[in-house]
Swiss-Prot record:
Highest rank taxon of the organism: Eukaryota
GO biological process per UniProt: alternative respiration
Disordered: annotated segments: 330-357
Compositional bias of kind Basic and acidic residues: 348-357
Official protein name in the record: Alternative oxidase, mitochondrial
Transmembrane segment boundaries: 152-172, 218-238
Annotated disulfide bonds: none
Biological function: Catalyzes cyanide-resistant oxygen consumption. May increase respiration when the cytochrome respiratory pathway is restricted, or in response to low temperatures.
Keyword line: Electron transport, Iron, Membrane, Metal-binding, Mitochondrion, Mitochondrion inner membrane, Oxidoreductase, Respiratory chain, Transit peptide, Transmembrane, Transmembrane helix, Transport
Subcellular location: Mitochondrion inner membrane
Cofactor binding description: Binds 2 iron ions per subunit.
Length: 357
C-alpha cells in the first residue's frame, strides 16, 4: 500500500499548492509544493546588496525583511529523516562536556582536533573564551570580536565540514555490507541521519546570510582535503575516526554555547528580531514562523550534543560485531539506554558495559 507523507497544515505557506508526485524509487507518495504566479509576483528582489570584497571572509547578513525572499519555493520535499522533538528546557540544559582521552588513539584524535580547530580559529578570526572576563568583554576592539557576519561564516564553514564524516562512514559501511553479504546492524541509518542533519544546519545558515567567495573557496578546498583523508582513515581505523568526530562535536557544542551567550547578552543586534528561514521551522518540529534566532541556535547546539554522544558511543563498540544502540529502542529494560531525544543522554558516550547489544 502506498503511504502519503503530509506536513503539518500550520506549516504550509500561503500561495503554495500541494501536488502529489509518485516516487518510483521509494514506492511512496510525497507532497511537493509549487509556487504560484501570485507568489512569485509577491516575492520581489531582495534588498540586501550582493556586492562583497572577494577577500572578505565575513558573511553578508541578509536584511531582516529579506530573509523570506531567499526561501526555496519550488519542489520542496519532506525531510528524509524527521527530526525528534526537543523541548526548550532540554535544549537549555545542553552544555560543553569533554571526554578525557584514555588511550593512545584517543589522544591522537584529540590532538588532531586541536590542530584543526586552531587553524579554523585563525582563519575565521575566532578565539575561544577561557575566562568570565573574556565572555563578558567579547574581545571587543580586537580581531577576535565576533560580529553577526563572522558568526555566520564560522557556522557555515563548521557545518560544511561536519556533514562529511557521517556521509563517508555510511558509504564505506554500505559497501562493506554489500561486499560481505551481511547486515550492518543499523549503523548506516544513524550515520546518514547525522550527515543529513548537519546539511540541514548548513542550508539554514545560508538562508540567513551570503558567504563571500573567499569563504566558498576555503570550503571547496577544506572539503576536498578532509573528505579524502577521512575516507582513508576510516578504512584503516573506524574506531578512532568516531572518537575524532566525538571531539569535533565537542568543539561544535562549545562554539554554539558561546554563540548562545552572545545572543542572550544582546551583543548581536542584527539577530534580535530576525525571522528564521522557512526551512528551519519546517525541519525542527517545535519551531514556528515566529521563533527567534536563539531558539534556532539552541536546537542546533542540541543536535551537535547528540552527535557528540553518538560518536563517542560508537567509538566504544566493536566496529564489526556490535549493533548500533541508537538504531533500536529495546522495550522492558530496567537500565536506561540510548535514545534519539534529550531526555536520556551521556555526553561522554555510553560505555559498552552499559548497553544491551
Amino acid at each position: 500500500m502506498l503511504s502519503v507523507q503530509t506536513t503539518r497544515a500550520a506549516k504550509l505557506q500561503l500561495g503554495q499548492l500541494p501536488s502529489i508526485a509518485y516516487t518510483a524509487r521509494s514506492g511512496r507518495l510525497h507532497h511537493q509544493f509549487y509556487s504560484t504566479v501570485a507568489e512569485k509576483t509577491a516575492n520581489p528582489t531582495p534588498n540586501t546588496s550582493d556586492k562583497t570584497n572577494i577577500f572578505d571572509i565575513r558573511t553578508k547578513v541578509y536584511d531582516e525583511t529579506d530573509i523570506r525572499k531567499h526561501d526555496d519555493n519550488q519542489f520542496i520535499t519532506h525531510p528524509l529523516f524527521p527530526h525528534p522533538t526537543f523541548s526548550q528546557e532540554d535544549c537549555l540544559k545542553v552544555g560543553y562536556e569533554h571526554r578525557p582521552p584514555r588511550t593512545f588513539g584517543d589522544k591522537m584524535a584529540f590532538r588532531g582536533i586541536e590542530l584543526v580547530r586552531g587553524s579554523f580559529d585563525f582563519v575565521t578570526g575566532y578565539k575561544k573564551p577561557k575566562t568570565q572576563a573574556d565572555i563578558d568583554s567579547g574581545f571587543k576592539g580586537t580581531r577576535y570580536e565576533m560580529t553577526e557576519g563572522k558568526w555566520l561564516t564560522r557556522c557555515i564553514f563548521l557545518e560544511s565540514i561536519a556533514g562529511v564524516p557521517g556521509a563517508v562512514a555510511s558509504f564505506i559501511r554500505h559497501l562493506h555490507s554489500l561486499r560481505l553479504l551481511k547486515r550492518d546492524k543499523a549503523w548506516i541509518e544513524t550515520l546518514l541521519d547525522e550527515a543529513f542533519n548537519e546539511r540541514m544546519h548548513l542550508l539554514t545558515f545560508i538562508k540567513i546570510g551570503k558567504p563571500s567567495w573567499f569563504t566558498r573557496t576555503i570550503i571547496y578546498v577544506g572539503q576536498g582535503v578532509f573528505c579524502n583523508l577521512f575516507f582513508l582513515f576510516y578504512l584503516a581505523n573506524p574506531k578512532y575516526c568516531h572518537r575524532f568526530v566525538g571531539y569535533l562535536e565537542e568543539e561544535a557544542v562549545s562554539t554554539y554555547t558561546h554563540f548562545v551567550h552572545e545572543l542572550q547578552s544582546g551583543k548581536l543586534p542584527k539577530f534580535e528580531n530576525i525571522k528564521i528561514p522557512t526551512i528551519a521551522w519546517q525541519y525542527w518540529p517545535e519551531l514556528t514562523e515566529n521563533s527567534s534566532m536563539l531558539d534556532l541556535i539552541l536546537r542546533i547546539r542540541a543536535d551537535e550534543a547528540k552527535h557528540r554522544e553518538v560518536n563517542h558511543t560508537l567509538a566504544n563498540l566493536d566496529q564489526r560485531k556490535d549493533r548500533n544502540p541508537f538504531g533500536l529502542a529495546i522495550p522492558d529494560l530496567k537500565e536506561p539506554q540510548p535514545e534519539s531525544g534529550l531526555k536520556v543522554t551521556k555526553p561522554h558516550g555510553w560505555e559498552k558495559e552499559e548497553l544491551k547489544l
